[in-house]
Amino acid sequence: MLHLTLRQLRYFDALARHRHFGRAAGACAISQPALSEQIKELEEKFGTALFERCARQVRMTGLGEALAERVGTILAAVDELDGLAASHRPLRRLRLGVIPTVGPYLLPSVMQDLTAAYPDLDVHVRETITGRLAEELGQGRIDAAIVALPVAGFEATPLFTEEFLLVRPRAEAAAPPPALENLRAARLLLLEEGHCLRDQALSVCGQNPPREAFAASSLSTLVQMVGAGLGVTLIPAMAVAVEARSAPVAVTRFAAPQPSRTIGMIWRKTSPLAKPLREICEIVRRAGEAVGGIAPRG
C-alpha cells in the first residue's frame, strides 16, 4: 500500500500543471521548501522519480506523466464528493469561469445580482479562453463556465443570443456596410488563436483567414486598431456600450439575417450543483438581456 494523502496528490497535480516549483507552491499557498518536501516524500513512496529537476523548469518522468492523468481523475472525483455534500447545504462557494469576450461586459451586473440573491456565497471567477475553461471544468477545478455555445461534453443551458456588429473607422460611417460574404476581402482584425470569437468571426466571413489579419488579445485592442484606420472588426452587442466610446469608430448592424452567437452556462453532467446552477442561470440570463441579449426561443 502506498498510503498516499490527498494533500500530496493536490501538490503533485499543481506541480504537474505548472512545471515550476515556485508557481506550484504559490498555487497551493505553501512555501516552496514545503512543496519540495512533499514531492520528495511522494517519490519515495513510489520508489522512483516523478519529476526531473532542471535549472529553470521541471520535466515529468514517464511515470509522472502516467500518474498525472490518473491523479486529475481522482481529484475530480474527490471534488464531486465535496460537491455532493455541498448540494445538501446552502450554496457557499462557486468557482465560475467566463470567456474574455463576455466577462468585462456581463460580470459586474451578474456579481451584483449573485450577491443580492446569495449573500453568503463566495464566488471565485476565472477568466480565460474556452478551451482552458473546458479543461478546468472537466478536471473539477471550476464548477461552471459562461461560454459561447456549443461546447461538447458538458451539460449546457442556453441563456441568450446576441448579434455581432461591424466596427469600422468613423470616417466610413456614411458608407453602406459590406455584405458578410465580402468581409473575406476586407482588412478584418481578429482576436488571437484560441478565442472562440475569432473562430466565430471567421465563420461569418468564410472558412479561410482574411488577408492582412491582425491578432489581438482583447476586444479593446481590436477597437483601438480600427479607430486608427487599420481595418474593421466584429464585436458582440454587449461590448458596444463599453468599447465603441473609447475610439473614433462607427458601429453598424448587418442586414438580416444578422450573424450572432449564443451564450450559455456549462457544467459537468455529474455535478451535484446542478440545481443551484440552474437557478444561477436565470440570474445570468437576466443580466444578459439587460445588455442586449435576446432570450432563446422555446
What role is predicted for each listed range?
Residues 154-189, 193:
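Flexible hinge/capping segments at coil-to-helix
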